[in-house]
């Protein structure tokens, strides 16, 4: 039995789809926070179980008879590590044999990316638990780029704060498929830590040029101070803590924390990952 947390989210849901595609008879539990949130999974051949990272007993109950756990990192801010720690403790108590965890590329306690420390602590907790593990250190999602770029097509410019440092972007569907590959052959990924990236990194200047070629409109990249980026995010109606988080992502990009390419994703998929150029064509050639 496999338990997928965050099952109604993009990454968890796509991982379920890939697992079922690989083996329609696979037994999957899908962890959701409420019956309401589980409704969109009703048409999938999975067992829906309700639980919450902060409700320890619900986690232990959800993990009954589970051999492998995909712990999709929480998107909740503030107590992310506490949530993960609960899940790891519950997994150990329930007798889970293997935890697959979705971390961040090159997880580093000194990262500019403010949530990196939560990932570092979670990785440490998993290793200290004695449960077998696989750490999937995912690079930045290409899927987030359109919202990062904003109205660049209309304004003619991408205003961001990543300097001209290159960033490796990978698509979420490739990451989900890699999760399914690992979970389906778990014995061969015991106690491994993988850096999950696409094949090539690009700067935001490169991205502006790519979008220009795709759309036929001249787009330039304008590097703005991080404080200006934060102000723009807040003006767009997002809360201050979200602005701080998004600014920290830009800061981490600027110092090269996402300028890394690794062959692991290609090896897991048995094909080249989707390149950023291909992804952008799918978004901006419509």
Tell me what each language-model feature is:
Residues 73-155:
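Glycine-/Pro-rich loop/turn segments that contact NAD(P) or position catalytic residues
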Residues 211-255:
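Terminal hydrophobic/aromatic helix or amphipathic segment near a protein terminus
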Residues 166-173, 197-213, 227-228, 274-275:
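Substrate-binding strand-loop-helix patch
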Residues 32-94, 108:
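NAD(P)H-binding glycine-rich loop region in Rossmannoid oxidoreductase-like domains
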Residues 144-150, 182-193, 259, 286:
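Glycine/proline-rich active-site loop of Rossmann-fold NAD(P)-dependent oxidoreductases
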Residues 161-183, 192, 203:
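Substrate-positioning beta->alpha
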Residues 264, 272-286:
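Amphipathic terminal alpha-helices
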Residues 2-22:
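N-terminal Rossmann NAD(P)H-binding glycine-rich loop of SDR-like oxidoreductase domains
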């Amino acid at each position: 039995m496999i338990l997928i947390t965050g099952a109604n989210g993009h990454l968890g849901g796509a991982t379920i789809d890939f697992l079922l595609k690989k083996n329609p008879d696979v037994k999957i539990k899908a962890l959701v926070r409420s019956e309401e949130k589980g409704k969109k999974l009703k048409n999938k051949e999975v067992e829906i179980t309700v639980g919450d990272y902060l409700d320890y007993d619900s986690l232990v109950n959800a993990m009954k008879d589970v051999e492998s756990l995909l712990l999709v990192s929480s998107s909740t801010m503030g107590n992310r590590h506490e949530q993960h720690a609960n899940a790891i403790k519950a997994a150990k108590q329930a007798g889970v044999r293997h935890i697959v965890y979705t971390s961040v590329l090159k997880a580093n306690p000194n990262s500019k990316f403010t949530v990196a420390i939560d990932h570092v602590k979670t990785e440490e907790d998993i290793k200290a638990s004695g449960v077998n593990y696989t750490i999937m250190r995912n690079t930045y999602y290409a899927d987030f780029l359109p919202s990062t770029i904003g109205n660049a097509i209309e304004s003619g410019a991408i205003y961001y704060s990543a300097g001209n440092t290159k960033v490796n972007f990978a698509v979420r569907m490739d990451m989900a498929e890699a999760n399914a590959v690992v979970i389906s052959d778990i014995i061969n990924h015991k106690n491994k830590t993988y850096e999950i990236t696409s094949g090539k990194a690009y700067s935001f200047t490169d991205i502006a040029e790519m979008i220009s070629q795709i759309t036929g409109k001249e787009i330039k990249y304008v590097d703005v101070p991080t404080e200006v980026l934060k102000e723009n995010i807040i003006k767009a109606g997002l809360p201050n803590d979200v602005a701080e988080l998004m600014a920290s992502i830009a800061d981490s990009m600027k110092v090269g924390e996402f300028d890394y390419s690794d062959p692991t994703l290609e090896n897991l998929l048995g094909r080249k990952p989707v390149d950023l150029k291909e992804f952008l064509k799918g978004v901006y050639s419509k």
